[in-house]
């Protein structure tokens, strides 16, 4: 565990700045599409998104005028979005996807301003125009499509329990009774426990990032963590004393989030993702999976198929 704690300490947060004057300006469009809210009220397949297009609109034009894509990311999620302690560079599956978006819109994968945002600040960062996109293992669900717009799914995950290997906790079941369980604020893991906790103690044990849950687990302050299995696998890779318990108990999809009303940006993102999924084992998606996730999440043969809607 000491090695994992050392890696944790090596990560320094990038601030989600509130001021102007850095050439970043406002991000995204301003209008809110009523049709999206109506869809949320009758939600069945929230992962359906607008059909892809390369046409420019207000949101794309603003990014091009600025000359930089502002991306809200995590830098504490191993394999997904984290700061390499040896080089100081942001790396991971989500970071590769951000770079693909920047290359498509601006012609250069390096034209990105990264802003680290906590789990519970992802929606607010979009509403307040602090970022153009959030690429941060953000689950698409019926509640969230009332607040933000999403691309098609770029990864399928599920909620799962992480606990010490020697723990009597067996998974998302009665073995959690009386146990202290950590979740991230604003996460679907918290929502799952709020709906059915099996007697676990989780109120007052939320943190701003999933990595903080791992630290609490290492320090013995909590008995288990509930989070996306994709994130939990990365946490287990950082600390060989913990492991995933039981099976995933939900099916969730990650999407790129943007401000409501930024339809042109959503369509452009879906165009980028269509290209990103292509090529089979030699395509960008499978190469990124092989580089970042395959060792900890083996067995994935292809990216999730996109689902579209017409309005």
For every predicted segment, state its role:
Residues 90-105, 138-141, 157-209, 224, ...:
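Bilobed "Venus flytrap"/periplasmic-binding protein-like clamshell domains
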Residues 101, 126-127, 176, 217-218, ...:
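Hydrophobic residues within well-ordered alpha-helices
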Residues 155-163, 233, 237-273, 295-311:
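Periplasmic-binding protein-like
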């Amino acid at each position: 565990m000491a090695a994992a704690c050392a890696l944790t300490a090596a990560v320094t947060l990038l601030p989600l700045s509130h001021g102007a004057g850095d050439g970043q300006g406002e991000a995204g469009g301003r209008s809110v599409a009523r049709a999206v809210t109506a869809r949320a009220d009758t939600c069945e397949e929230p992962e359906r998104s607008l059909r892809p297009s390369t046409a420019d609109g207000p949101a794309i034009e603003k990014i091009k005028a600025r000359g930089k894509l502002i991306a809200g990311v995590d830098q504490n999620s191993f394999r997904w979005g984290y700061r390499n302690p040896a080089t100081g560079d942001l790396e991971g599956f989500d970071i590769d996807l951000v770079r693909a978006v920047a290359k498509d819109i601006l012609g250069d994968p390096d034209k990105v301003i990264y802003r680290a945002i906590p789990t519970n600040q992802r929606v607010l960062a979009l509403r307040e125009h602090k970022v153009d996109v959030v690429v941060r293992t953000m689950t698409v669900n019926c509640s969230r499509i009332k607040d933000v717009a999403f691309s098609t799914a770029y990864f399928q995950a599920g909620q799962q329990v992480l606990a010490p290997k020697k723990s009597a906790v067996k998974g998302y079941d009665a073995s959690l009774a009386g146990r202290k369980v950590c979740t991230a604020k604003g996460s679907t893991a918290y929502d799952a426990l709020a709906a059915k906790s099996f007697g676990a103690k989780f109120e007052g044990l939320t943190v701003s990032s999933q990595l903080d849950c791992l630290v609490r687990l290492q320090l013995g302050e909590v008995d288990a963590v509930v989070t996306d299995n994709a994130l939990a696998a990365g946490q287990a890779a950082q600390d060989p004393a913990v492991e995933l318990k039981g099976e995933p108990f939900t099916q969730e999809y990650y999407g790129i989030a943007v401000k409501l009303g930024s339809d042109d940006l959503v369509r452009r993102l879906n165009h980028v993702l269509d290209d990103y999924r292509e090529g089979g084992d030699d395509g960008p998606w499978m190469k990124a999976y092989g580089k970042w996730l395959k060792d900890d999440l083996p067995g994935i043969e292809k990216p999730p198929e996109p689902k579209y809607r017409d309005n």
